[in-house]
């Protein structure tokens, strides 16, 4: 059986909040078996903890945010969540000095890099549990849709449709089969993106105050404003897959299924998760044997 994992040691990360523009400090700590993904706001006295699960998702406008029953929240969790999922980590305590996870360079790579090189991953003596999708689950909203079907792998077949010359000149669809190595090499470095006109509007409304070319792909009327250009020719759709991996893992579980979407986004991901977990006959818990294709991908 494949085993649960955590960090080998604690690590510190510094950055800035995308929307607040303020400095943020993270400490990622090892956690015992069956702890799950725990976020701990240490800027509040006493500290407030969130165990990541679908019921805590409260806001999916521009990012994914968690909020407890007392209204305490943590926002922009998706890129860190994707890094934790992508590295196969099951148990971790994330201490944070703000209400917002730092945006870093707009991808999961800074988190992946520091976890691998400054901590490493420790195997724990307890079987890892997965959620298997048993029946097709689909949600639609206007011309957008997303579905998941039963599979013995975690795959994402996503398409976007942006009517902008910069994005439409790139491939807007991508099929990805999850594995730790493929996540690191194909997905983790894909950055979030935004249009200059939207960033200016958001900043005028005191949002995206930390947004710039150091933490996102910024798109002008006819070109990308980042001097270094794109990291992948299809970086936009790859980042959409990164967001989905992070959002699905906010449920607290690795979900085994074939995901397919047209015009995905945080809200569509959340709608799908709600429908999955609302209908218990659509999924089941299971451990996996080492010869299972999904485990081999890990």
Swiss-Prot record:
Gene that this polypeptide is encoded by: lpxC
Needed cofactors: Zn(2+)
Family of this protein: Belongs to the LpxC family.
Annotated positions binding Zn(2+): 79, 239, 243
Keyword Hydrolase recorded: yes
Listed GO CC annotations: membrane
Reactions it catalyzes: a UDP-3-O-[(3R)-3-hydroxyacyl]-N-acetyl-alpha-D-glucosamine + H2O = a UDP-3-O-[(3R)-3-hydroxyacyl]-alpha-D-glucosamine + acetate
Record protein name field: UDP-3-O-acyl-N-acetylglucosamine deacetylase
Known role: Catalyzes the hydrolysis of UDP-3-O-myristoyl-N-acetylglucosamine to form UDP-3-O-myristoylglucosamine and acetate, the committed step in lipid A biosynthesis.
Pfam family, one: LpxC
Pathway in which the depicted protein is active: Glycolipid biosynthesis; lipid IV(A) biosynthesis; lipid IV(A) from (3R)-3-hydroxytetradecanoyl-[acyl-carrier-protein] and UDP-N-acetyl-alpha-D-glucosamine: step 2/6
UniProt-listed Enzyme Commission number(s): 3.5.1.108
InterPro entries the record matches: Ribosomal_Su5_D2-typ_SF (IPR020568), UDP-acyl_GlcNac_deAcase (IPR004463), UDP-acyl_GlcNac_deAcase_C (IPR011334), UDP-acyl_N-AcGlcN_deAcase_N (IPR015870)
Active site: 266
Keywords assigned by UniProt, alphabetized: Hydrolase, Lipid A biosynthesis, Lipid biosynthesis, Lipid metabolism, Metal-binding, Zinc
Chain segments annotated as transmembrane: none
A GO molecular-function descriptor: metal ion binding
GO terms, biological process: lipid A biosynthetic process
């Amino acid at each position: 059986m494949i085993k649960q994992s955590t960090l080998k040691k604690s690590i510190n990360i510094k950055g800035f909040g995308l929307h607040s523009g303020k400095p943020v400090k993270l400490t990622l700590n090892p956690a015992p078996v069956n702890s799950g993904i725990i976020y701990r706001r240490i800027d509040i006295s006493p500290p407030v903890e969130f165990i990541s699960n679908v019921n805590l998702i409260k806001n999916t406008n521009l990012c994914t945010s968690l909020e407890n029953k007392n209204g305490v929240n943590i926002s922009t969790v998706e890129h860190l969540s994707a890094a934790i999922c992508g590295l196969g980590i099951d148990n971790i305590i994330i201490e944070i000095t703000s209400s917002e996870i730092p945006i870093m360079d707009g991808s999961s790579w800074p988190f992946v890099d520091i976890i691998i090189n400054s901590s490493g991953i420790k195997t724990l003596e307890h079987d890892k549990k997965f959620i298997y999708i048993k029946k097709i689950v689909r949600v639609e909203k206007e011309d957008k849709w997303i579905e998941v079907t039963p599979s013995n792998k975690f795959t994402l077949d996503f398409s976007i449709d942006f009517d902008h010359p910069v994005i439409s000149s790139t491939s807007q669809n991508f099929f990805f089969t999850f594995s730790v190595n493929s996540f690191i090499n194909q997905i983790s470095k894909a950055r979030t993106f935004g249009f200059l006109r939207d960033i200016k509007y958001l900043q005028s409304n005191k949002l995206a105050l930390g947004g710039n070319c150091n933490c996102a792909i910024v798109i002008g009327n006819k070109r990308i404003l980042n001097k270094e250009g794109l990291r992948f020719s299809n970086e936009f759709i790859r980042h959409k897959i990164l967001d989905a991996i992070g959002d699905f893992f906010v449920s607290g579980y690795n979900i085994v299924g074939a995901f397919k979407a047209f015009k995905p986004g945080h809200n569509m991901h959340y709608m799908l998760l709600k429908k999955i977990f609302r209908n218990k006959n659509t999924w089941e818990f299971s451990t996996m044997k080492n010869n299972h294709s999904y485990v081999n991908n890990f």
